[in-house]
Amino acid sequence: VSCSDEAVENGRVPLEVYNIVDYILGLEKEDRQSNPARNTYYKTFSSPMQRALTSYCQSGGNLLISGSYIGSDMNNSQGDREFTQNLLKYAYGQSITDSYSGNISGLGRTFSSPRLPNEYAYPVTAPECILPTGGAFPVLTYNSGNQSAAIAYQGNYRTFVMGFPFESIEKETDRNAIMASILQFLTTDSRK
């Protein structure tokens, strides 16, 4: 099932009925400079979304999140930082602004995400380093600087959070293999 974030935020789509939720943020972020109304329509995790994801995780849900601005967009208030650190289990490290390499390693693979404009995919000009918190661990690293590109957490619920858009992985074979690893992590019952 696919739906808009607004459908989740207003309660039309209850997350608790799904074993796994994939929240794809792409390049979404709050943009107060080009938005004269100064609203938070494009905020990565609005207050209603934070409530929905908190409820979902507290019910034992499994969450995959990916996006270029999931750290920096949530680093401006203590409440936003507490949400990402305490529930999603990551903290913002920094944005990578060089364009030298889009190579990422982990889960038995090295793959790439475009950093410069091209005719095949949108560029991820500033992927984010996200740091594990509260029992989470790094699972993917950016090859330039060996910094954390994705974290995973396993407790009463599970999270797999990527500091770049999943859909930006260039090769289909890499996307398929990475998704298979993510789904295995999110669905494996550790109590067996």
Where are these regions (language model features)?
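Aromatic-Pro/Gly-enriched surface loop or interdomain linker
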Residues: 1-27, 68, 157, 165-169, ...
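Conserved beta-strand termini and adjacent loop/short-helix elements that scaffold enzyme active sites
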Residues: 3-6, 140-143, 162
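Alpha-helical scaffolding within the catalytic cores
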Residues: 5-12, 47-52, 144-149
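Extracytoplasmic/periplasmic, Sec-exported soluble proteins
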Residues: 10-13, 41-48, 170-174
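Extracellular/periplasmic catalytic domains that process cell-envelope and extracellular macromolecules
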Residues: 13-17, 56-59, 131-133, 153-155
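Active-site beta-strand/loop signature of hydrolases that rely on acidic residues for catalysis
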Residues: 25, 60, 162
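A glycine-rich, often tryptophan-bearing local segment used as a flexible ligand/cofactor-contacting loop or short
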Residues: 29-125, 129-136, 141-143
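Extracellular ligand-binding/catalytic regions of CAZymes and related secreted enzymes
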Residues: 75, 79-97, 132-137, 145-192
